[in-house]
A protein has these predicted regions:
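P-loop NTP-binding module
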Residues: 1-307
Length: 307
């Protein structure tokens, strides 16, 4: 049984009464231990299954690829950023880690789903704060961009934005400023040369975030951005207790729900799942757990040392 299901059962979440999608085909387990902590399951859990990404990619190549974005967003400003280990953006800082492998596999799954349904704009959210949705959003954007696809990461949490700060971008004009402006064309988008994707930061948190999002300007912006990019990843606010995410859900093609092992409880997860249309739920990403074989994973698959 998938470790996702194991974790849900340990938390009693299998009793929520909500039917989950096929986690084996649309979700990923992110083995990421919090700083300075080890998993309570480390001594008893078995090794994680080996993921053969090459086989999955070969299967995916047999399908007809969706139409790529044709208009290069070259008019947007390019920024040099320094991604540090503290940022936890493992697609840059730890590309050979098992955590990065899990994100790459999630990217493979998303591409596979796109062969059977329209999928370009992905909403990443969680039931409550502090479950790691922003970290997942950035890493998903990073692994998708590694395939030379044009990826835009939108910092859609106008109330408590964190992504721009974690990338060291400072106070840049972003989504909030565009929504308040009279501009008719998309702006306040920046290409991050290191990570390889574009980002639209939230900007300065406005007092009327929900009112701005419901003004009609946001849908106008998304209509402009959709043909410019192959993927648009939206890091949204938590589902509870705000209504902001329901606005984003109407403008995106599918939702990834982030849950954190040891943090996410049954009641808020149930309420969060009930707020997502079943047809929109791509899967659940389990965050904050440790694979006991993490340190030895790539040692087994590395070339032998030269003697």
């Amino acid at each position: 049984m998938s470790r996702i299901f194991d974790a849900l059962q340990r938390s009693g979440l299998e009793q929520t009464g909500v039917e989950y999608p096929d986690m084996m085909t649309v979700a990923a387990e992110v083995f990421e231990a919090p700083h300075g902590q080890t998993s309570a399951n480390q001594a008893t859990a078995g090794p994680a299954p080996v993921i053969d990404e090459q086989v999955a990619l070969a299967e995916m190549a047999k399908a007809i690829m969706p139409e790529r974005a044709t208009d290069a967003p070259g008019e947007f400003r390019s920024l040099e950023v320094c991604v540090t280990a503290a940022s936890r953006f493992v697609f840059v800082t730890e590309p050979d880690s098992l955590v990065a492998e899990k994100f790459r596999f999630l990217g493979v799954r998303l591409r596979q789903i796109r062969h059977s349904r329209s999928l370009k704009k992905i909403l990443v959210t969680s039931a409550i704060p502090q479950e790691g949705k922003s970290l997942v959003s950035a890493n998903v954007a990073g692994v998708l961009a590694r395939r030379k696809e044009k990826v835009l990461l939108i910092e859609g949490d106008l109330r408590r934005p964190v992504l721009a700060q974690q990338f060291g971008l400072g106070r840049l004009a972003g989504l909030a400023e565009w929504l308040q402006s009279g501009l008719q064309t998309a702006s306040n988008i920046y290409h991050l040369s290191g990570p390889g994707f574009w980002i639209m930061p939230a900007g300065d948190p406005p007092l009327n975030a929900l009112e701005l999002m419901q003004s009609g300007r946001l849908s106008q912006l998304m209509e402009q951005l959709t043909p410019l990019f192959d993927w648009i990843i939206v890091d949204s606010p938590p589902l509870l207790p705000l209504a902001d995410t329901t606005v984003w859900a109407r403008m995106t093609d599918g939702t990834l729900l982030v849950a954190r092992e040891g943090i996410t409880e049954k009641a808020p997860l149930q309420r969060g799942l009930e707020m997502i249309k079943k047809s929109d739920l791509l899967g659940i990403v389990l965050n904050g757990c440790m694979n006991p074989d993490h340190k030895n994973y790539y040692r087994r698959y590395s070339p032998p040392a030269v003697k």
